[in-house]
């Protein structure tokens, strides 16, 4: 099997993946700020790095996968105050909702899922190190800030120079900062902060800045120098750039070897975002589409490419996934183990080892489905299920997928018992040689989105289309 190659944002190129410790991978992914339901952009991040950790394990690595939860942040505080509830009540509620969404999408839980509020002492310890090393200072307003000009390599991840940032970036003015580009490490408490929003420190009561949270959790749980750090493309700057500055400023060593970023989700060629009002929650999508269809919609696009969200693309994903399940419908897979020397498995592995190239890997699944349709071969059916399983797909009994009702069918379509009753009426019509009535029932069912397949021996199977 070829070596895994990953596009490293830091190097701006694909690189052969070499872990720091042979056979082991330590990976940190920036998780979700829990003040609302997860949206499609979150779904993409969750699925992408679920695929990455699944593949790393499939090729034999022992993986420690950490994905954090941001449970203290200005948006969280504002929402809790608006709702008249405690911060913990709000965050616990949306963490539970996030876990429900993840389960629906087939996301395997990370090995460690730290909450920011569990690591306040470690954050303060890192801030004190930065102060000792000359990178941090307490401003007149009580905030502790990071002095970006003290870090010689600032901008190495994003490719942004400090001079360009000063000229072109929108930086919030703050007279207390030594430089407008400096960012906050510790926010001094405000008089109207609600309970649970601040902690005691040598700098006074306050709370951590967003960037220090991930630096402290990553270094504490995975060590000061680890293999992979991932997140959405929108986090590359300033969040991940600031993480590097903090972590390397505190420890004096390389923070992360490989940086991976998934692309944006777009609607009509614009980035999906709350500010534009064009975003959809996972729950809203799952009211209309099966969760595996949503996962497949994400999987079949390369993780670094833009993902264009539309009903047309989701409908196409549903039709494509239906083709894969249909190929397995009447073939019982054999029980042999996956053999990476099999040609389809080799092509699948080559694709996944080429920067997690899921479009090519999915194409291999359709090659297998086509051959199964021609040959009804049990070993090919087994390969299809095994390889798709590595992507978190095709885990259900085919008829369970093909006969399920989602979206419009669920809201106003025929229930399974109604369909079976009409099939029975059609069988009776055929037995009475009333073929016109039998054809009418078939057409009526097709109009309702139900396709019939007459099998040898007189039985009839159905599926939703």
Swiss-Prot record:
ATP binds at residue 274. Its cofactor is Zn(2+). This is Cysteine--tRNA ligase. It comes from the Bacteria. It catalyses: tRNA(Cys) + L-cysteine + ATP = L-cysteinyl-tRNA(Cys) + AMP + diphosphate. A motif ('KMSKS' region) lies at residues 271-275. A motif ('HIGH' region) lies at residues 32-42. Its main location: cytoplasm. The keyword Lipid biosynthesis does not apply. It is an enzyme of class 6 (ligase). GO terms for molecular function: ATP binding; cysteine-tRNA ligase activity; zinc ion binding.
């Amino acid at each position: 099997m070829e070596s895994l190659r990953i596009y490293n944002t830091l190097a701006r190129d694909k690189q052969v993946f070499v872990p720091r410790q042979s056979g082991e991978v330590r990976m940190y992914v920036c998780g979700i700020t829990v003040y609302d339901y997860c949206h499609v952009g979150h779904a993409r991040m969750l699925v992408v790095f679920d695929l990455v950790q699944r593949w790393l394990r499939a090729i034999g690595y022992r993986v420690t996968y950490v994905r954090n939860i941001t449970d203290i942040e200005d948006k969280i505080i504002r929402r809790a105050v608006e709702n008249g509830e405690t911060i913990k009540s709000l965050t616990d509620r949306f963490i539970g909702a996030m876990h429900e969404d993840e389960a629906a999408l087939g996301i395997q839980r990370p090995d460690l899922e730290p909450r920011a509020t569990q690591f306040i002492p470690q954050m303060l310890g890192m801030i004190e190190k930065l102060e000792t090393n000359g990178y941090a200072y307490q401003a007149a307003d009580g905030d502790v800030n990071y002095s970006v000009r003290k870090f010689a390599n600032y901008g190495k991840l994003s490719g942004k120079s400090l001079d360009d940032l000063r000229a072109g970036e929108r930086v919030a003015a703050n007279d207390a900062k030594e430089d407008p580009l400096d960012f906050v490490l510790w926010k001094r408490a405000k008089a109207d902060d609600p309970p649970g929003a601040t902690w005691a420190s040598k700098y006074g009561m306050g709370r951590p800045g967003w960037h220090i949270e991930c630096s402290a959790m990553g270094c504490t749980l995975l060590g000061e120098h680890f293999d992979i750090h991932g997140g959405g493309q929108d986090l590359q700057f300033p969040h991940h750039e600031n993480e590097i500055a903090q972590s390397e400023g505190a420890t004096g060593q390389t923070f992360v070897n490989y940086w991976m970023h998934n692309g944006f989700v777009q609607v009509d060629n614009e980035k999906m975002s709350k500010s534009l009002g064009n975003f959809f929650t996972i729950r809203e999508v799952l009211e209309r589409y099966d969760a595996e269809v949503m996962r497949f919609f994400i999987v079949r696009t390369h993780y670094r490419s833009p993902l264009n969200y539309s009903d047309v693309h989701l409908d196409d994903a549903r039709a494509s996934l239906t083709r894969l399940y249909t190929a397995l419908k009447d073939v019982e897979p054999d029980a042999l183990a996956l053999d990476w020397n099999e040609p389809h498995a080799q092509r699948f592995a080559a694709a996944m080892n080429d920067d997690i190239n899921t479009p090519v890997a999915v194409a291999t699944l359709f090659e297998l489905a086509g051959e199964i349709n021609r040959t009804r071969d049990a070993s090919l059916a087994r390969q299809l299920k095994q390889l798709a399983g590595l992507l978190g797909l095709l885990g259900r009994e085919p008829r369970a997928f093909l006969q399920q009702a989602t979206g419009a069918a669920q809201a106003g379509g025929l229930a399974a018992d109604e369909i079976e009753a009409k099939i029975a009426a059609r069988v009776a019509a055929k037995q009475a040689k009333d073929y016109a009535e039998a054809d009418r029932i078939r057409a009526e069912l097709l109009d309702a989105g139900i396709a019939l397949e007459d099998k040898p021996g007189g039985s009839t199977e159905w599926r939703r289309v």
